[in-house]
């Protein structure tokens, strides 16, 4: 790693998606600033990824803007906003405060990240948000993810309009249910609501996919990396659907 390399900033860097994204962007030759709440988790990630810049910050707090900005010492090629939100249950039972928290993390967090990096963005820089399938295809059992990811898409569209004149593009990546520990928590919550076994819920989730699969963190990282191509300018304001054939609606 050299100091001349452009940076990628990854929020949620120690999660399943985040670690795969960090690996992919580091392999692409970018210096990576990894943002997460846990300093211990960041230290473990730094041991695995040589040259990683660890930045302990809570993206749900406005204080993160100054903390992240202080970690940036050169041009930023890409920012990736991928924090997780809590499993709040279905729309009939989810605490309203949990929904507000989810929007604060997803939308408020994205805006904090953008503001932290703004002075380092240049023509060709990418703003990337990791949303989710439930923002487009709602379910009664994932209220926080559905509401927050729908709002996130709107925010990405607004950012694409605001940053377009500067040659900076904004993108949403929307994975379907992914093979992660968080999915197991979602399945357990849904199983409790329906009074069935967790394995039955997971089987139902697989059946929703036209290819009978969950999305993987590696596939999400691949989608992030392809946005580095100059041709991806044409995709600003759009969503990359990585739902393994789950979406039924048009367009």
What are these regions (language model features)?
Residues 70-74, 105-125, 160-161, 229:
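Amphipathic alpha-helical dimer-interface segment in Rossmann-like NAD(P)H-dependent oxidoreductases
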Residues 85, 92-112, 128, 145, ...:
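Catalytic Tyr-X3-Lys loop
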Residues 164, 169, 235-237:
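Short, small/polar-rich loop/turn modules that mediate ligand/substrate recognition or access, typified
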Residues 48-63:
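Rossmann-fold cofactor-recognition segment
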Residues 232, 236-251:
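Short C-terminal tail/terminal secondary-structure segment
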Residues 82-88, 245:
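Conserved NAD(P)H cofactor-binding loop of Rossmann-fold oxidoreductase domains
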Residues 126-165, 176-178:
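Catalytic loop of short-chain dehydrogenase/reductase
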Residues 14-15:
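Conserved glycine-rich cofactor-binding loop
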């Amino acid at each position: 790693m050299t100091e001349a390399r452009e940076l990628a900033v990854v929020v949620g860097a120690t999660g399943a998606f985040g670690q795969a994204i960090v690996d992919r962007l580091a392999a692409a030759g970018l210096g990576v600033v990894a943002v997460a709440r846990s300093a211990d988790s960041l230290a473990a990630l730094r041991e695995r990824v040589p040259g990683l810049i660890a930045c302990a910050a809570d993206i749900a707090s406005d204080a993160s803007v100054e903390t992240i900005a202080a970690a940036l010492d050169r041009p930023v090629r890409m920012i990736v906003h991928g924090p997780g939100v809590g499993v709040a249950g279905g729309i009939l039972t989810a605490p309203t405060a949990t929904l507000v928290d989810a929007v604060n993390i997803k939308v408020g967090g994205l805006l904090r990240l953008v503001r932290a990096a703004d002075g380092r963005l240049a023509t060709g820089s990418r703003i990337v948000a990791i949303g989710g399938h439930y923002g487009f295809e709602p379910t009664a059992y994932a209220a926080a993810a559905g509401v927050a990811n729908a709002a996130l898409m709107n925010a990405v569209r607004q950012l694409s309009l605001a940053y377009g004149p500067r040659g900076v593009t904004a993108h949403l990546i929307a994975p379907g249910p992914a093979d992660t520990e968080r999915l197991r928590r979602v399945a357990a919550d849904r199983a409790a609501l329906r009074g069935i076994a967790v394995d039955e819920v997971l089987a139902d989730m697989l059946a929703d996919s036209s290819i009978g699969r969950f999305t993987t963190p590696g596939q999400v990282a691949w989608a992030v990396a392809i946005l580095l191509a100059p041709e991806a300018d044409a995709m600003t304001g759009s969503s990359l659907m990585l739902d393994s054939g789950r979406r039924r609606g048009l367009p």
